[in-house]
């Protein structure tokens, strides 16, 4: 009974302990789930009590084992830390006691190094540092003797090197001082210094000035050429006033001027041939037209300076005077010395000028006129060219002109007759203008060639114009009035001014804007014919009458150019050759 009771009590206690352990495990697992989110998948209620007891016992043993192991490791580490300092001291004390010879050798090596550094003080015997040892002292006594025996030549060598270095440094310093004194002219030691006299200094200064002046002139030669080309128009009879002063740079200027004068004829030829690359209107380049118009509007009543044709190709830069343009170099002595009031080119500038609306057009109006059609009222009445003939009561007709073809033929026949006389007059004017300059045989030959080429070109022009008129008259009568009158105005210009036709017909007029008018050129031909009529009045009066008729009938050109103004490439080449020969 007693034995059973002991076992029963033990079983009861085990069950109670297992129940507590189950509760604790369940609480712990719930804590892990709720707080840490760990689900181990254990359910302590399913397991029997003895399993729980065995597991808890095993865990307890593991914990005890881990705690004991950690404690033992901590204790071992503490013991090692406590025992390590005395061991190091014992080792440090045992090393010198074990090897005294090594210490002596180290000391000897150190002493030798110090002796090498301090060789100047080696006359005295060095004493060994540290403790005195018999072996060490013997070695120390032996080494100084050998060192003292070897040191004197080395010391001498170093002293010599130091002396050489000092000498070199002194010589370098002297050279630097000498170079600074003599302004870059190095003077060697021991060399004789040559003194320069005042006369030589003056000559050297003159040479330096000449060099600087020549350098500046060489750099400004293009500017000098430009100024000379501008001012040569005033120097038709006078010489260039540069050589008045005998300065050092004047020789270059005189040479430049002489070269320029000698090559003046060539330059005019180059300029005139260069016009073949530009389209021409009134003898000038088309690219220059807008510039001319804009500047002429702002100029007011400005005068044309009388310039001989030899100075053609150079333009003045003064805004108050107008000289002959490069494009007008080969127009056979046009009268450029007339005032604006007599010129009648630009309306609104001169008081008696003919009111032409095109003369005051600006670049903007050129562009606008391409898109806007012309109005007949602008070219009729007081706004048109009828002011040249105050008795005319011409107005723009609404139907085709019936008698206009006959007038054209008659005017062409009349205008073709006095061509040689007009040519003679223009050639005489050109000879007068060129007579002012000093000319040679070469220029006279050029004049003769010009006359021959121009006579040939005028004859060719008249024949070609007659053919073109015969071909185009039936076509023009059926076309609109502006086209007919534009072709006629071009033909009258070509018959009255053959040299101007050379300039105009030397290039195709394809790229000209369609809205450009030929009215200024018509008026120029009128002014030239006025001049020629004043010189040869009985011959050229008929041409003036025909031109007045053409001016009354002149109309702004339409958008499409008439085909009468075109020429074949062979004719253009012939005219170019004639111009080159001139």
UniProtKB/Swiss-Prot annotation:
<dbReference type="GO" id="GO:0003725">
    <property type="term" value="F:double-stranded RNA binding"/>
</dbReference>
<dbReference type="GO" id="GO:0046581">
    <property type="term" value="C:intercellular canaliculus"/>
</dbReference>
<feature type="modified residue" description="Phosphothreonine">
    <location>
        <position position="143"/>
    </location>
</feature>
<feature type="compositionally biased region" description="Polar residues">
    <location>
        <begin position="354"/>
        <end position="372"/>
    </location>
</feature>
<dbReference type="GO" id="GO:0000122">
    <property type="term" value="P:negative regulation of transcription by RNA polymerase II"/>
</dbReference>
<dbReference type="GO" id="GO:0003713">
    <property type="term" value="F:transcription coactivator activity"/>
</dbReference>
<dbReference type="GO" id="GO:0043123">
    <property type="term" value="P:positive regulation of canonical NF-kappaB signal transduction"/>
</dbReference>
<feature type="compositionally biased region" description="Basic residues">
    <location>
        <begin position="160"/>
        <end position="169"/>
    </location>
</feature>
<dbReference type="GO" id="GO:0003712">
    <property type="term" value="F:transcription coregulator activity"/>
</dbReference>
<keyword id="KW-0965">Cell junction</keyword>
<feature type="modified residue" description="Phosphoserine">
    <location>
        <position position="339"/>
    </location>
</feature>
<feature type="region of interest" description="Interaction with BCCIP">
    <location>
        <begin position="72"/>
        <end position="169"/>
    </location>
</feature>
<feature type="modified residue" description="Phosphoserine">
    <location>
        <position position="478"/>
    </location>
</feature>
<feature type="modified residue" description="Phosphoserine">
    <location>
        <position position="568"/>
    </location>
</feature>
<feature type="compositionally biased region" description="Basic residues">
    <location>
        <begin position="571"/>
        <end position="582"/>
    </location>
</feature>
<keyword id="KW-0472">Membrane</keyword>
<feature type="modified residue" description="Phosphoserine">
    <location>
        <position position="369"/>
    </location>
</feature>
<feature type="region of interest" description="Interaction with RELA">
    <location>
        <begin position="101"/>
        <end position="205"/>
    </location>
</feature>
<feature type="modified residue" description="Phosphoserine">
    <location>
        <position position="308"/>
    </location>
</feature>
<dbReference type="GO" id="GO:0061629">
    <property type="term" value="F:RNA polymerase II-specific DNA-binding transcription factor binding"/>
</dbReference>
<feature type="topological domain" description="Lumenal">
    <location>
        <begin position="1"/>
        <end position="48"/>
    </location>
</feature>
<dbReference type="GO" id="GO:0051059">
    <property type="term" value="F:NF-kappaB binding"/>
</dbReference>
<keyword id="KW-0597">Phosphoprotein</keyword>
<feature type="compositionally biased region" description="Basic and acidic residues">
    <location>
        <begin position="109"/>
        <end position="127"/>
    </location>
</feature>
<feature type="modified residue" description="Phosphoserine">
    <location>
        <position position="494"/>
    </location>
</feature>
<feature type="modified residue" description="Phosphoserine">
    <location>
        <position position="306"/>
    </location>
</feature>
<dbReference type="InterPro" id="IPR052305">
    <property type="entry name" value="TransReg_TumorExp"/>
</dbReference>
<feature type="compositionally biased region" description="Basic residues">
    <location>
        <begin position="441"/>
        <end position="451"/>
    </location>
</feature>
<dbReference type="GO" id="GO:0010508">
    <property type="term" value="P:positive regulation of autophagy"/>
</dbReference>
<feature type="compositionally biased region" description="Basic residues">
    <location>
        <begin position="198"/>
        <end position="208"/>
    </location>
</feature>
<feature type="region of interest" description="Disordered">
    <location>
        <begin position="280"/>
        <end position="582"/>
    </location>
</feature>
<feature type="modified residue" description="Phosphoserine">
    <location>
        <position position="496"/>
    </location>
</feature>
<dbReference type="InterPro" id="IPR031402">
    <property type="entry name" value="LYRIC"/>
</dbReference>
<dbReference type="GO" id="GO:0003723">
    <property type="term" value="F:RNA binding"/>
</dbReference>
<dbReference type="GO" id="GO:0005783">
    <property type="term" value="C:endoplasmic reticulum"/>
</dbReference>
<feature type="modified residue" description="Phosphothreonine">
    <location>
        <position position="458"/>
    </location>
</feature>
<dbReference type="GO" id="GO:0043066">
    <property type="term" value="P:negative regulation of apoptotic process"/>
</dbReference>
<dbReference type="GO" id="GO:0005789">
    <property type="term" value="C:endoplasmic reticulum membrane"/>
</dbReference>
<feature type="modified residue" description="Phosphoserine">
    <location>
        <position position="344"/>
    </location>
</feature>
<dbReference type="GO" id="GO:0005634">
    <property type="term" value="C:nucleus"/>
</dbReference>
<feature type="compositionally biased region" description="Polar residues">
    <location>
        <begin position="504"/>
        <end position="520"/>
    </location>
</feature>
<feature type="modified residue" description="Phosphoserine">
    <location>
        <position position="311"/>
    </location>
</feature>
């Amino acid at each position: 009974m007693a034995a059973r009771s002991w076992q029963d009590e033990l079983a009861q206690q085990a069950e109670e302990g297992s129940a507590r352990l189950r509760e604790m495990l369940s609480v712990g697992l719930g804590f892990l789930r709720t707080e840490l989110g760990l689900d181990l998948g254990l359910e302590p209620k399913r397991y029997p009590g003895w399993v729980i007891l065995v597991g808890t016992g095993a865990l307890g043993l593991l914990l005890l084992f881990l705690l004991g192991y950690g404690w033992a490791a901590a204790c071992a580490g503490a013991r090692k830390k406590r025992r390590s300092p005395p061991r190091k001291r014992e080792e440090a004390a045992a090393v010198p006691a074990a090897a005294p010879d090594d210490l002596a050798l180290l000391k000897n090596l150190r002493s030798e190094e110090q002796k090498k550094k301090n060789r100047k003080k080696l006359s005295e015997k060095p004493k060994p540092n540290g403790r005195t040892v018999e072996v060490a002292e013997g070695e120390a006594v032996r080494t100084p003797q050998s060192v003292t025996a070897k040191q004197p030549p080395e010391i001498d060598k170093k002293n010599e090197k130091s002396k050489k270095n000092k000498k070199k440094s002194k010589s370098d310093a002297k050279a630097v001082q000498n170079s600074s004194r003599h302004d870059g002219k190095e003077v060697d030691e021991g060399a004789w210094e040559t003194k320069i006299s005042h006369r030589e200094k003056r000559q050297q200064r003159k040479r330096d000035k000449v060099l600087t002046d020549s350098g500046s002139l060489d750099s400004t030669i293009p500017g000098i050429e430009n100024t000379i080309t501008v001012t040569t128009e005033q120097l038709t009879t006078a010489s260039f006033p540069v050589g008045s002063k005998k300065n050092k740079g004047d020789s270059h200027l005189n040479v430049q001027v002489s070269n320029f004068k000698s090559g003046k004829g060539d330059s005019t030829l180059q300029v005139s041939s260069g016009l073949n690359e530009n389209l021409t209107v009134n003898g000038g380049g088309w690219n220059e037209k807008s510039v001319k118009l804009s500047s002429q509007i702002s100029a007011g009543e400005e005068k044309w300076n009388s310039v001989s044709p030899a100075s053609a190709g150079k333009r003045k830069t003064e805004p108050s005077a107008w000289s002959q343009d490069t494009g007008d170099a080969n127009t056979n002595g046009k009268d450029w010395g007339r005032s604006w009031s007599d010129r009648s080119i630009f309306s609104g500038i001169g008081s008696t000028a003919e009111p032409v609306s095109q003369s005051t057009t600006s670049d903007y109006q050129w562009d606008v006129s391409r898109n806007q059609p012309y109005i007949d009222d602008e070219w009729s009445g007081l706004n048109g060219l009828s002011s040249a003939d105050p008795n005319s009561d011409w107005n723009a007709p609404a139907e085709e002109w019936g008698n206009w073809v006959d007038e054209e033929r008659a005017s062409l026949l009349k205008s073709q007759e006095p061509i040689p006389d007009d040519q003679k007059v223009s050639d005489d004017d050109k000879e007068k203008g060129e007579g002012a300059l000093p000319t040679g045989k070469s220029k006279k030959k050029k004049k003769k060639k010009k006359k021959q080429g121009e006579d040939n070109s005028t004859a060719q022009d008249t024949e070609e114009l007659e053919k073109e008129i015969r071909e185009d008259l039936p076509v023009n009568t059926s076309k609109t009035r502006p086209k007919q009158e534009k072709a006629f105005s071009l033909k009258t210009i070509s018959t009255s001014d053959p040299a101007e036709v050379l300039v105009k017909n030397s290039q195709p007029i394809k790229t000209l804007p369609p809205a450009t008018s030929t009215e200024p050129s018509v008026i120029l031909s009128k002014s030239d014919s006025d001049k020629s009529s004043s010189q040869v009045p009985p011959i050229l009066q008929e041409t003036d009458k025909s031109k007045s008729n053409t001016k009354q009938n002149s109309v702004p050109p339409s958008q499409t150019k008439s085909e009468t103004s075109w020429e074949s490439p062979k004719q253009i080449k012939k005219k170019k050759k004639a111009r080159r020969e001139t």
